[in-house]
Structures are given as C-alpha cells and as structure tokens.
Swiss-Prot record:
Annotated family: Belongs to the archaeal histone HMF family.
GO MF: DNA binding; protein heterodimerization activity
Biological role stated in the UniProt entry: Binds and compacts DNA (about 120 base pairs per nucleosome, corresponding to four histone dimers) to form nucleosome-like structures. HTkA/HpkA has lower DNA affinity than HTkB/HpkB and compacts DNA less well. Required for transformation, participates in both transcription activation and repression in vivo.
Subunit structure: Homodimer or heterodimer. Dimers then assemble into higher oligomers, with the DNA wrapped around the protein core. Higher order oligomerization of these structures can give rise to long, superhelical fibers in vitro.
Key words of the record: Chromosome, Competence, Cytoplasm, DNA condensation, DNA-binding
GO CC terms of this entry: chromosome; cytoplasm
Acetylation among keywords: no
Impact when changing G17 to D/L/S: Expected to impair oligomerization. Alters compaction of DNA on nucleosome-like structures. Delays adaptation to a sulfur-free medium due to impaired transcriptional activation of genes required for growth on a sulfur-free medium
Region (Interaction with DNA): 20-22, 54-57
Other noteworthy facts: In a chromatin histone fraction 12% of the protein is this histone. Cells have about 2.5 x 10(6) histone proteins per cell, enough to coat all DNA with a ratio of >1 histone dimer for 30 bp of DNA, cells are polyploid with 7-19 genomes per cell.
Induction comment from the UniProt entry of this chain: After 17 hours growth at 85 degrees Celsius HTkB/HpkB is expressed about twice as abundantly as HTkA/HpkA (at protein level).
Source organism of the structure: Thermococcus kodakarensis (strain ATCC BAA-918 / JCM 12380 / KOD1)
Name used for this protein in its record: Archaeal histone HTkA
Lineage: Archaea, Methanobacteriati, Methanobacteriota, Thermococci, Thermococcales
GO biological process, one term: chromosome condensation
Length: 67
C-alpha cells in the first residue's frame, strides 16, 4: 500500500485531463509513483555518498533523474 495520499494523485490525473478518477486508479498510480521515487532516491543517495556527503541535495536528485 502506498504512503502517498490519494487526493493529490487524483488531482494530478484530473490535471492531465480526466473528468473522473476511480479510487483504484489513483491508488495504482500512487503505488507506482512511490516505487519510482524510492528508486530515484536510492540513486540520489549513491551520488551524495560518492561526493562524500550524507546530505542528499537537489543536484543529486537531478543527476539521478538523468541517470
């Protein structure tokens, strides 16, 4: 089960053009987004550690997105 709140995910889907969004659809997207964010965060942590830092910075996230 995703830790992300469903309401913001619902709003994202509506922002993409949906008139109505089922709760299941929002939950599935929330789960996917959470998995993606965790994988991206792991890469960012690796970049921070490689730079000799314990703190993950925006630049680490940007590098992880490009990697």
């Amino acid at each position: 089960m995703a830790e992300l709140p469903i309401a913001p995910v619902d709003r994202l889907i509506r922002k993409a053009g949906a008139e109505r969004v089922s709760e299941d659809a929002a939950k599935v997207l929330a789960e996917y987004l959470e998995e993606y964010a965790i994988e991206l965060s792991k890469k960012a942590v690796d970049f921070a550690r490689h730079a000799g830092r314990k703190t993950v910075k925006a630049e680490d996230i940007k590098l992880a997105i490009k990697a």
